[in-house]
């Protein structure tokens, strides 16, 4: 099968996963047919392919466009039959299950394909009952048929299925912000410079569309639009927490408490009530899939780096004193926490990130020199650190955060810190 020319590279990779599953499903059908023809002959069946694909991304990341393109491209494939496109937001779990079941039962092709947009709309009930009803009444029977591939879009990653047969046959794939080469392709029919567009939008598809419509936008105007768009419908206090949380690559409730509360106030809230309030707001952000808990980091992070950077920049441009204050508090907090060698891998990047930001208003080269000096001063105190893990997170962790750090401290100092980590790794292995 040829690759669709109007899909960007990262989306082509996702499209290929669907094509591979279709091909594998067809091979299984052929193996079954061969077994039916000659029951005495042992036929080796291929590994069962995924039958449920969930493509998830932030608001405006191009989920519906991706589904429409998949439908258009696969409609030319005579080996499969596309049964329909459902918008889950227009149904209850019961009516969606019935509609899909009725359509599937009427068809007889070997390999069927159904597309479902806004699958996360079935998660409006925090108990998940609607989604699990849909799982048991529609997804499980479809997967057990072995002849239907389900392609769904969602604003959140969905993988906590109750049924084992669903869990083992599903895959989640994120629609990430576009890389610079994809931005160039996105802007082919415009006169907009791709590097400038990357700076303004951080590669978010919705923001790129808006930038094409408003090519004279400044960073401040784009960030203000993003803040309004991504935080639409949030209560004022949750919006404030989100704006401050966006300043952190990763965050936990303890650092949020430090930056959200004035601990010098005489009439502080009851600690339990305060922590409960923060937890409630963070839970709302996770339900809206603005943030998610990162098990490896042991902290929360934004699900979309472009969204985080756009909101953070809006805070920097509109509340600069507060932005600097938060980075100063965070730098002190993470440097203190990083004294615990056991958690260095989880804390090192945040320590550098906030230290660099806290010094960013000073002369050129100062942030990088200060960060390098901190690492040199601390390295002999990090006895027994897992340097391989620290180096791995530093070099291969969050690309967007690494990009920000390089912009803050310069590639020269980034390389020097990398060299120090590598030297410590080598020494620890001797």
Enumerate the language-model features and the residues they cover.
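A eukaryote-biased feature capturing mid-to-C-terminal, repeat/solenoid-rich segments of large proteins
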Residues: 220, 231-233, 311-348, 362-402
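Walker A/P-loop nucleotide-binding motif
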Residues: 49-67
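Alpha-helical sensor/transducer elements of the RecA-like P-loop NTPase core
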Residues: 65, 120, 130-196, 200-210, ...
């Amino acid at each position: 099968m040829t690759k669709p020319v109007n899909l960007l590279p990262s989306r082509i990779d996702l499209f290929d996963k669907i094509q591979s599953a279709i091909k594998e499903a067809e091979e299984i059908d052929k193996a079954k047919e061969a077994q039916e023809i000659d029951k005495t002959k042992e036929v080796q069946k291929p590994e069962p392919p995924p039958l449920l694909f969930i493509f998830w991304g932030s608001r405006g990341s191009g989920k519906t466009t991706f589904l429409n393109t998949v439908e258009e491209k696969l409609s030319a494939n005579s080996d499969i039959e596309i049964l329909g496109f459902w918008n889950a937001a227009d149904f209850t779990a019961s009516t969606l299950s019935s509609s899909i079941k009725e359509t599937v039962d009427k068809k007889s092709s070997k390999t069927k394909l159904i597309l479902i947009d806004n699958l996360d709309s079935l998660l409006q009930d925090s108990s998940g009952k609607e989604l699990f009803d849909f799982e048991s009444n529609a997804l499980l029977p479809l997967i057990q048929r072995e002849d239907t591939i389900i392609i769904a879009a969602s604003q959140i990653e969905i993988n906590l299925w109750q049924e084992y047969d669903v869990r083992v046959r599903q895959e989640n794939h994120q629609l990430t912000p576009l890389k610079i080469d994809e931005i160039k392709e996105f802007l082919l029919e415009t006169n907009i410079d791709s590097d400038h567009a990357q700076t303004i939008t951080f590669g978010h598809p919705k923001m790129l569309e808006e930038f094409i419509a408003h090519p004279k936008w400044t960073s401040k105007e784009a960030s203000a639009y993003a803040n309004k768009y991504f935080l639409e419908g949030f209560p004022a206090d949750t919006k404030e927490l989100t704006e401050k949380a966006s300043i952190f690559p990763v965050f936990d409730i303890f650092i949020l408490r430090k930056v959200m509360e004035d601990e010098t106030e005489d009439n502080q809230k009851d600690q339990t009530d305060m922590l409960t309030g923060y937890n409630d707001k963070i839970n709302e952000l996770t339900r809206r899939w603005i943030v998610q808990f990162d098990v490896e980091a042991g902290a929360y992070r934004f699900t979309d780096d472009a969204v985080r950077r756009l909101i953070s920049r809006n805070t920097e441009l509109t509340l600069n004193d507060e932005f600097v204050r938060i980075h100063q508090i965070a730098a002190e907090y993470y440097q203190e926490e990083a004294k615990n060698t056991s958690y260095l891998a989880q804390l090192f990047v945040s320590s550098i990130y906030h230290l660099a930001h806290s010094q960013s208003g000073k002369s050129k080269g100062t942030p990088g020199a200060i960060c390098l000096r901190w690492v040199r001063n601390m390295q002999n105190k990090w006895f027994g650190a897992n340097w391989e893990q620290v180096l791995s997170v530093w070099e291969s962790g969050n690309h967007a955060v690494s990009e920000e750090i390089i912009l803050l401290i310069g590639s020269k100092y980034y390389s020097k810190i990398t060299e120090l980590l590598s030297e410590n790794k080598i020494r620890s292995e001797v």
